[in-house]
């Protein structure tokens, strides 16, 4: 994802449920990124962890000469507005996500909370 953006090329990503079968389907894809959609599903850290592991194609990483996985994993966390649920983002990053997609952030206070 970063390589495409640094070279000025468009980066393409897809959305998928945080399930190992979806991760396996996308592991060898040509997408630059994959967003695991965790906003509209019950939060399941074990399923997310397994999905992040199944997404890694270690041979592809080795052959690329960089430690950056392709597709780069992101997680769309549950709403972070009034609930102030940063713990979802922290847990997703701890499990191996490379980035967070914050839904429904519409006020400055919510944006500050998201990056606090």
Kindly label every feature range from the protein language model:
Residues 1-116:
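Expand to "…catalyze enediolate/carbanion chemistry for C-C bond making/breaking, isomerization
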């Amino acid at each position: 994802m970063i390589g495409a953006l640094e070279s000025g090329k468009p980066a393409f990503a897809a959305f998928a449920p945080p399930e190992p079968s979806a991760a396996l389907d996308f592991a060898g894809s040509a997408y630059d990124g994959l967003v695991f959609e965790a906003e509209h599903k019950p939060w399941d850290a074990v399923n997310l962890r397994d999905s992040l592991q199944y997404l890694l194609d270690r041979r592809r990483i080795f052959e690329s000469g960089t430690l950056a996985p392709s597709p780069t994993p992101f997680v769309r966390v549950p709403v972070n507005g009034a609930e102030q649920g940063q713990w979802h983002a922290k847990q997703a990053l701890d499990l191996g996500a490379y980035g967070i997609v914050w839904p429904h952030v519409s006020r400055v206070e919510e944006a500050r909370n998201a990056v606090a």
